[in-house]
Amino acid sequence: MTADSNGYVGFDLALFIAEKLRAQFVFDMAQMEENTATYPQVETIVCGTSVAGLSVSETRQIDNINRGWQALIEDLRLKRFQINKLVTIEYNKLVSESENRLGFGGFRNAPVAIGGTSYTPPTHLDLNSCWDELIARCQELEDNPLEQSLLLYAEMARNQFFGDGNKRTALLMMNGNLIQNGLCPITITKSREVEYRTALNGYYESPEQHRIQFFDFLKQEQQTMLKRWGYEIQDVSKSAPVITVK
């Protein structure tokens, strides 16, 4: 049994991975937001039970991220996931409730800045045109859903469409498109945070120059997930690695 270099595993297995590892995905996303919850605490919250030892805001953040994943999985199961503005806004409302104060329920209504980089996101007045441009670029990649998904994540993070929760929303949208196309979902782990932020900040400042570096990082995280599910990556050629199941 083999999968191509895009991480194709089929829709059913891709969705099963997201369902089975939902607590892990929620935990990873929360950790990247500097949430101090442990994995057992996150798993308990995901299962619907309250835990002690966390602040109200940390507990709420975990619950919000979990609701975002629940909504995505349900949309995928019912075949209603789409890359559009309405879906994106709905996911952002779920993951950023009580955190987004710059136009909650829509695109942000004020300028924002990003720490650690000299890059300045587009003004809020240009966000609709930026979104339309992103959709057009995604449509050009219909035949390459992996690249399409990675571009969606990168540009949603770079444009900062929302007042908060941008990367969380982008991760949901990226994974929705991956899973919908039968590709293995991606989670970004805290252990690789420095590599992630270095690659992402490079993309912020010079997308064309750092696109390969950032996309390769995301592909490596996908390969890590594939290996976790028993897939072995064999470099048959430099341009077309083949992934096989043990």
Protein language model features and the residues they cover:
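FIC/Doc superfamily catalytic core
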Residues: M1-K246
